[in-house]
């Protein structure tokens, strides 16, 4: 016959196992939803970039967002970001098209994630107007979840291979 103490211990163990499993399932479901929302953020940014819409491209960043190009040129804050995108979209990247593919998403906290994105670009020109070779590289973004639930770019670093 099983003692009362053993029955209570088994009941508590089963309850804790079920509760933690349920909590894990809920957390995994939330992470899946957030991963999908982050991928949507990447897709919306890529779409704005390919339309050469400086305002919408910069609008994917938080107000004090930070950008660093493949050459190390930084832009900080909404006004600088929009000016940067306006300049490249009206000059050497005015005919460029890019493809961005999310490689990985790593949640640092429930509201902060690091995102690695493989990118490819065609149609670029050199600064003196000559056709540039196709390019590819890696973007590393830090994205943050806003109070609205929207994910936005906080830090953007770009490297070319």
Question: Which residue stretches match the model-derived regions?
Answer:
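Bacterial N-terminal signal peptides that target proteins for export
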Residues: 1-11
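Short helix-adjacent coil turns
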Residues: 45, 51-53
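Bacterial N-terminal signal peptides
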Residues: 9-21
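A short acidic/glycine-rich loop-to-helix N-cap element
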Residues: 127-133
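Short beta-strand edge/turn micro-motifs at domain boundaries
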Residues: 135-161
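Beta-strand elements of well-folded, non-transmembrane domains
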Residues: 50, 121-127, 143
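A solvent-exposed, acidic/Ser-Thr-rich amphipathic alpha-helical stretch
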Residues: 32-41, 54-111, 116-118, 133-134
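Boundary at the C-terminal end of the N-terminal hydrophobic targeting segment
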Residues: 23-25
């Amino acid at each position: 016959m099983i003692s009362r103490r053993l029955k209570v211990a088994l009941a508590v163990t089963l309850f804790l196992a079920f509760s933690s499993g349920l909590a894990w399932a809920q957390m995994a479901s939330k992470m899946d939803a957030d991963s999908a929302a982050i991928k949507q953020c990447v897709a919306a940014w890529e779409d704005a970039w390919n339309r050469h819409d400086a305002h919408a491209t910069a609008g994917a960043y938080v107000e004090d967002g930070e950008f660093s190009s493949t050459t190390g040129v930084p832009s900080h804050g909404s006004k600088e970001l929009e000016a940067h995108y306006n300049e490249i979209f009206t000059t050497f990247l005015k005919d460029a098209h890019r493809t961005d593919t999310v490689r990985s998403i790593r949640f640092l906290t429930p509201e902060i994630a690091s995102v690695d994105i493989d990118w490819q670009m065609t149609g670029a020109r050199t600064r003196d107007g000559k056709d540039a070779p196709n390019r590819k590289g890696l973007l590393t973004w830090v994205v943050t979840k806003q109070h609205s639930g929207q994910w936005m770019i906080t830090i953007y670093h770009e490297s070319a291979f």
